[in-house]
Amino acid sequence: MAFITNSQGGSKNETKGGPGALVLLPFTFVGRTVIDWVDNLGAATIFLFTALTKTFGRKQLFKIVEQIYYIGAKSITIIMLVSLFTGMVLGLQSYHALVKFGAQGALGSLVSLSLIMELGPVLTAIMITARAGSAITAEIGIQRISEQIDALHTMRINPLRYLVSPKIIAAIISFPLLTAVFDLVGIIGGYISGVVLLGVNAGVYLHSIQAYVDLRDIINGFIKVIVFAVIVSTVCCYQGYFAHMRKDSHGAQAVGLATTSAVVLSCVLILVSDYVVTSLLI
Amino acid sequence: MHTPLIEFKDVTKRFGNRTVLERVNLQIYEGQVTTIIGLSGAGKSLILKHIIGLIQPDEGAIFFRGKPIAGMKKTEIATSFAQMSYMFQGNALFDSLTVYDNIALPLRETTNLKKAEIDRRVMARIEQTELTEAAHRYPSELSGGMQKRAALARALITDPQIVLFDEPTSGQDPVRKNAILSMIAQYQRKFNFTAILVSHEIPDVYFISNRILALYDRRIVFQGTPEELENFDHPFTDEVINSMEALQKELTGLYSKRQFKIFNHVQMRRSKSGEFYCIVFFSLQELNTIITKFGHDAAQDVLRDMGLYIDKHFGAIGGFSTRRDTNELITMLPYANLSEAESIIKDFVHDFHGQVTRTIQAAACKSVLGEPTELTIMAGIAQGQSTSNIDAVIALAKSQQKEIGRLHCAAGE
C-alpha cells in the first residue's frame, strides 16, 4: 500500500520507508484488517445465499435428513446434560436471591424465562458449535485440501449443493428443536433444585411458568436461535470450504486453524448477534 | 490436420509473482492418448486443471473443438465439461464413502438412472478393475494400488469421452505402474475415449501414447510422437528424459529405446566396417488373453520375468536389450554372426524350457479360474552389418519369428 501525498511529483520511495511509514503502520494494520473483514463478510454472505439457492433439488431431502441426524439427533445427549445442570444451577442461584425478597414463588417464571429467552438459544448454539460446527469445518476443510471438492467439480456435482446446503438447512431445522429440548430439560432442572431439593411448592413453580411465560417469549427465543443457526452453519462451512486460501498456513495446519477460527468466530458472533436481535425484539 | 479437440493458445498462468505457464501452445487430438511429460513442479497438472476448468488462464485462450471456452455460453461450457472426467494424482476418493459408493457417486448425483442400473454399471466397473473384494471397504483400508484402481473406476463410470489422468501411476511398484498404464491403454481402445496423461513413467508411457507433449521451462517445447521425441535435440532431452530413464527401467530391467539406440550407435562406431551383429526379436503372444483372464498384474509379471531373464542371459555375453512395445522385446548381440546367434538362442531356449518356463508360468497363471489358456513366446533372429540400417534388421528379425515356448495355464496347475 502506497501513501503518496505529494501529487506534484513526490517520490514513491519517500513513502515506503522512514518514520512516516512507521507512524502509519497501526493505521495500515487496522485498515487492512477492516478490509479483510468486509471482504470476508461479503464473501460469506454470497456463499450463504448461493448455498440457499441450492436447497431445492433432487435427492437433497435425504442429505438434509442425514445432516439433521448428525447435527441434531447426535447432539441431544450433550444438550440435555448441559441444560439439566444449567437449569439446576439457575434454580439454586435464583432461589437464594428470591428468598431475600420473599419472592421464591416466582422461581418457575424466572428459570423458564431465562432459559427460553436467553440461555436456551445461546447455550444450545454454543454447544452445537463446539460439537458439530467444529466437525463440519474440519470435514469440509479436509475435503478441500485432499481435492475431494475439486473432484466434485470435475464430476459436475455442485459442492455447495452436495456439501454445504444440506448442512445449513439441517442447522436451521435442528437448532430450534434442540433449543426446545434445552428449555424443557432446563426447566426440569430448575424444578429438581427448586422443588425437590429446596422445597418450593411444585404447584407454585409450574403455575408461575404458566402465568408469566408468553408465546411471544418462546417465538423470540426461536427467532434468535434461527439467526444463530444461520451464523454458525455459514461460518463453519465457509471456514472449511476456503481453508486452502488461508494466508497464515497450509494443508493440515490450515484445517486446524480454520476449525479454531470457526469455533471462536461463531461464539463471538452468537453473542454479538444475541444483543442485536434482543434489542430488535424487545 | 483436423481441428484439435483441445487447443491452448499463448496460455499464461501466474501465482503471485511466479509464472508457472508462459505462452503455452499445445494441441490435443480426439481419440488419441496424449501424455504430458516434464519435471516435478513444472506445471503439468496445472495444464490438466486448465483443461477441465478448475483453473482459468491469466492470459491466452483455451479452445474446445475449435471454439474458445471463454466465449462459450454457460450451457455450452457445461456440455463440454460434462464429456470430461478427471483422475486425480492423490485419487481424491471420498474417505467417508465405500469404494462402491465412491464409484456410484457421479451416477447417483448427475443422472436419473434407477438404483438397479447404477448397481449393474458400478459392479461391472468394479469387476473390470479387480476390486470386487474391496467394494464395501473404505479407501483408507485399501492399498495405494487399489485406491488408484478405485479412482480409475470412478473416472470411467460415466463413460466420458475425454479422461484426464494426473500421474495415475505415482507411488506404485514397477509391476503395478505398468499394469495401470496397460489398463488405461486397454480401456482407451475399448471405450475409444481421448486420454490425456501427466506421467513420469518414461519410457513405459511411450508404449501407450500416440503423442507426447514436453513441458520445459514453463513452455511446451515438443509435441509429437514418441518416435519423434527420440530424435528431439533440446536441453529437455538431457535434463529430463535422461534423468527419468535412469530411474525407469525397473520393470523389465532393460534399457529404454533411446538408451538402446545410443548403445547401438557406440557399438557401430567401435566396430570395423562390415562387422556383423545380430538382432533377436522376442514377442509374447496372447498377452491380452492373460490380461483379460488373469488381470494386468499377471501380464506385467510375465513381462518383468521375461525381461529379467533376457537381460541376465544376454547381458552376460555382451548383449543389450530393450522393450520395443507392450509385448515385444529386442536384444542386440554385437559381433555375433547368424550361426553364433543361433547357437546362443539354442542355449537360451534350453534354459528357458527348464527353470524359466516355470517362473513365467507361475506369474502368468496366477489364480487360474475357468477355461485353460496358453501364452506363446516367439523369437526371430536377423543378421546385420555395421553399415546396415538397424530398423530394417529389426523388421527382418520380427518377420522370422518362430515359437520357442508355450505356457499352458489351467486350474489346479
Where are these regions (language model features)?
Chain A
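Hydrophobic alpha-helical transmembrane segments that constitute the membrane-spanning cores
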Residues: V82-F85, A125, S165-G194, V235, ...
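Selective transmembrane-helix segments that form parts of the transport pathway or gating/packing helices
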Residues: G72, I76, M80, L119, ...
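Short cytoplasmic-facing helical segments at TM-TM junctions of multi-pass membrane proteins
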Residues: I140-S165, G251-V255
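Active-site cofactor/substrate anionic-group-binding motifs, chiefly glycine-
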Residues: Q67, I71-L123
